[in-house]
Amino acid sequence: MLEDFLSLSKSNQDLTPDQMQQAITWMLAGMVPEEEIGRLLLSLREKGESVSELVGAVRAMRMMMTPIRTTRVGLLDTCGTGGDGTKTFNISTATAIVAAAAGATVAKHGNRKITSATGSADVLSELGVKIDADRSVVEACLDELGICFCFAPLLHPAMKQVATVRRSLAVPTLFNYLGQIGRAHV
């Protein structure tokens, strides 16, 4: 199903936004075997993901996500990329807490560790935060407290289609960047 896209990537050619959107849509709809997903993700990583590919991937993600509604404006999201390879502490979560304490409105987006030592969800869970709160609770926290945690599996349920392959690859892929640029429509 992704053969044409894989061929382009292996030829060091960038996929167009429409091509990438189609590829990600098929992946997230569960239409593509994991081996094929892995081959394309690794090929894109080796070539270097392009802006056009990230644009297409963000479009696909936004079409399939659960949005968060808020009355707040000027939101900050400190979503990290995960997988820094150096086993550093989770600075994006610490940044979210400090920024909110300083008065910023923060919609912290994140997940459990996939390719890093700790994910935001791991850190917050250890601190006693209910990371899998309903969307209405997340929205109320943001509106009333000025900070919330947007747990990726609840806002991006289709990502479960690529979770196993991402873990098996054990290296960051374009999905690590989508959290930063394709946030929960807050």
Give the role of each language-model region:
Residues 80-85, 110-116, 155:
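Acidic, glycine-rich active-site loops and adjacent beta-strand->loop/helix elements
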Residues 58-82, 135-165:
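Self-splicing inteins and homing endonuclease
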Residues 184-186:
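Conserved small/polar residues in nucleotide/adenosyl-binding loops
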Residues 77, 106-110, 131-134, 149-151, ...:
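General beta-strand structural signal in soluble alpha/beta enzymes
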Residues 111-113, 137-139, 160-166, 171-178:
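A generic local secondary-structure boundary/capping motif
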Residues 41, 89-145:
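A glycine-rich phosphate/pyrophosphate-binding beta-strand-loop-alpha-helix module
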Residues 112-113, 129, 154-157, 182:
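Short acidic/polar capping segments at secondary-structure boundaries
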